[in-house]
UniProtKB/Swiss-Prot annotation:
Protein family per UniProt: Belongs to the universal ribosomal protein uL2 family.
Gene Ontology biological process terms, A to Z: cytoplasmic translation
Higher taxonomy: Bacteria, Pseudomonadati, Pseudomonadota, Gammaproteobacteria, Pseudomonadales
Identification of the protein by name: Large ribosomal subunit protein uL2
GO cellular component, one term: large ribosomal subunit
HAMAP family: Ribosomal_uL2_B (MF_01320_B)
Molecular-function GO terms, alphabetical: rRNA binding; structural constituent of ribosome; transferase activity
Length: 274
């Protein structure tokens, strides 16, 4: 990984900071593991905008990533290559299993082409191997953590993400997440050892608005720049500050208001995030 600052040969290049990884595969992705990905422009079946700031962008294919890793226990796999994935911040690794099947997984940090990986209860403790949490030593760093056994990884999947296994008690283990939250998870759930690759992703700078448009992100208009019919902060003679505490276009408090409402899983949280 290398952080590259572009020379200011044009206004659009002046602030560009790239993360360059020479190990990334330069060819096409593995075709059998691709699926069509259609664009909605943020509209639903009625043609109405349900998610703002979506539209345009380069055409993409979805890579089918194996988040479960539960039906290849004991079958060794060789990392064929590490690839870029436009659908996520992390890189993905193409595995070739001993039975001849190929699958994508989230690429762990430090894993490169030619490495051997395996999943299952007897897998050695090394980055990239997937085990049940009850078989992972206390103090280990893990990612791709399930919340329900067999459902597939849900926690710590983005670039540089990880959690630390800090305790094991009965049928539960306790994890410390990057947010500072400490949470109980069933020991039957699976996780992958190590942290997610591409941890330098947060250091990049796109440099210009057009680079966001290439990614399918449209501009965000401030509420105070709108008319009263469009936003609670809109209207007024001349420039105004909105005249009230910040709210969304639908009048709900924003900028710090708590939105968590899942009381059913409150019992699994040992300590709230910072």
């Amino acid at each position: 990984m290398a952080i590259v600052k572009c020379k200011p040969t044009s206004p659009g290049r002046r602030f560009v900071v790239k993360v360059v990884n020479q190990e990334l595969h330069k060819g096409a992705p593995h075709a059998p593991l691709l699926e069509k990905k259609s664009k909605s422009g943020g509209r639903n079946n009625n043609g109405r905008i349900t998610t703002r700031h979506i539209g345009g962008g380069h055409k993409q294919h979805y890579r089918l990533v194996d988040f479960r890793r539960n039906d290849k226990d004991g079958i060794a796999a060789t990392v064929e290559r590490i690839e870029y994935d436009p659908n996520r911040t992390a890189h993905i690794a193409l595995l070739l299993y001993a039975d001849g099947e190929r699958r994508y997984i989230i690429a762990p940090k430090g894993v490169s082409a030619g490495d051997q990986l395996i999943a299952g209860a007897l897998a050695p403790i090394k980055p990239g191997n997937a085990l049940q949490l009850r078989n992972i030593p206390v103090g280990s760093t893990v990612h791709g953590i399930e919340l329900k056994p067999g459902k597939g990884a849900q926690i710590a999947r983005s670039a540089g993400a990880s959690a630390q296994l800090i305790a094991r008690e009965g049928v539960y283990v306790t994890l410390r997440l990057r947010s500072g939250e400490m949470r109980k998870v069933l020991a039957e759930c699976r996780a992958t050892l190590g942290e997610v690759s591409n941890s330098e992703h947060s250091l990049r700078s796109l440099g210009k608005a057009g680079a966001k448009r290439w990614r399918g992100v449209r501009p965000t208009v401030r509420g105070v720049a709108m008319n009263p019919v469009d936003h609670p902060h809109g209207g007024g003679e001349g420039r105004t500050s909105g005249g009230r505490h910040p709210v969304s276009p639908w009048g709900f408090p924003t900028k710090g208001a708590k939105t968590r409402g899942n009381k059913r899983t409150d019992k699994m949280i040992v300590r709230r995030r910072k």
